[in-house]
Swiss-Prot record:
Cell compartments where the protein resides: Plastid, Chloroplast
Function comment: Binds directly to 23S ribosomal RNA and is necessary for the in vitro assembly process of the 50S ribosomal subunit. It is not involved in the protein synthesizing functions of that subunit.
GO MF terms held by the record: rRNA binding; structural constituent of ribosome
GO biological process: ribosomal large subunit assembly; translation
Entry keyword annotation includes Plastid: yes
A Gene Ontology term for the protein's cellular component: ribosome
Similarity section: Belongs to the bacterial ribosomal protein bL20 family.
Name the UniProt record assigns to this protein: Large ribosomal subunit protein bL20c
Predominant location category: plastid
Entry superkingdom: Eukaryota
Keywords: Chloroplast, Plastid, Ribonucleoprotein, Ribosomal protein, RNA-binding, rRNA-binding
Organism per entry: Guillardia theta
Record keyword RNA-binding present: yes
Amino acid sequence: MVRIKRGNIARKRHKKILKLAKGFRGSHSKLFRIANQQVMKALRYGYHGRKRRKREFRSLWITRINAAVRIEGTNYSCFINSLKRQHIALNRKMLAQLAVSDQNAFKQLTKITH
């Protein structure tokens, strides 16, 4: 038999990967090689998902602002342009929150920008 001097290290690494693979279906949570591949893929998906979430929320905010502004008779790009010209520093998240929760304040804001 060949003597293995890194047994503890390998066991720790295997345990770490199998712990990360907990909850995966079938052999994806039982066998090290397959679990390792699935963990790497899951981490990659998680990384991309965190980047994608920022884009999706920004587009959601823009959609909400656009819908609220169209009720007042203008469109999104004109509204944002007039906000910038008048040096009103509200970001899209705040504007979308205003449009959803406090329509009266949002109406006042659109009147200011006209």
